[in-house]
């Protein structure tokens, strides 16, 4: 979205970035090795008997236990495709998701941010505490990100995680629509 807003400013009236995966500036100067994360994501279970089996597997597991149950149900219902052999597989295969992590630092958004004049609202969850183990639920968003936009507003949501749209869809939808 940041790339589109910078390239096509007349096409976007405002931006709402929901706990965006925009790393601190220095991360793009010295890209980290995400191979461990990519490898872990790439090994995620891909085969399921069906949406009910997937729901039962995830409903009590972190981070899915944080999600609104109706959202988790929709994820399980609509996030699977028939595998052609009577079972189901993830619509976004684990290797495809892993490639997102592997290439996440290939485009530095920071030079683009200074060219965005539209109002930008950043919805942000808590970052991982120093010394804690990596958790996909923690925010990758720098607390000062909104300040870097010409017209930026930071909305810190300490009771939510990186999965905020799945945790509290009504609240996030209202913030997107009404600011």
Model-assigned labels for residue ranges:
Residues 156-170:
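Catalytic histidine-centered segment of alpha/beta-hydrolase-like enzymes
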Residues 115-160:
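Conserved loop-alpha-helix segment in the C-terminal half of the alpha/beta-hydrolase fold
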Residues 32-65:
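The alpha/beta-hydrolase serine catalytic core
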Residues 169-177:
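Short, amphipathic alpha-helical "lid/cap" segments that border enzyme active or binding sites
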Residues 1-30:
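Conserved hydrolase catalytic core segment
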Residues 69-111, 127:
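Hydrophobic, aromatic-rich cap/lid helix
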């Amino acid at each position: 979205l940041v790339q589109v807003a910078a390239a096509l400013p007349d096409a976007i009236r405002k931006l709402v970035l929901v706990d965006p995966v925009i790393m601190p500036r220095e991360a793009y100067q010295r890209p980290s090795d995400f191979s461990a994360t990519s490898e872990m994501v790439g090994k995620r279970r891909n085969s399921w008997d069906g949406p009910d089996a997937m729901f039962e597997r995830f409903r009590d597991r972190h981070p899915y236990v944080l999600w609104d149950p109706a959202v988790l149900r929709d994820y399980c219902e609509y996030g699977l495709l028939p595998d052609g052999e009577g079972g189901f597989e993830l619509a976004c295969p684990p290797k495809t998701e892993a490639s997102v992590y592997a290439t996440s630092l290939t485009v530095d958004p920071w030079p683009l941010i200074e060219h965005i004049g539209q109002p930008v609202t950043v919805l942000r969850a808590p970052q991982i505490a120093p010394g804690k183990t990596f958790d996909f639920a923690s925010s990758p968003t720098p607390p000062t990100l909104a300040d870097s936009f010409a017209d930026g507003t930071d909305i810190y949501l300490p009771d939510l995680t990186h999965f905020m749209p799945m945790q509290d869809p009504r609240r996030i939808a209202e913030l997107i629509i009404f600011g």
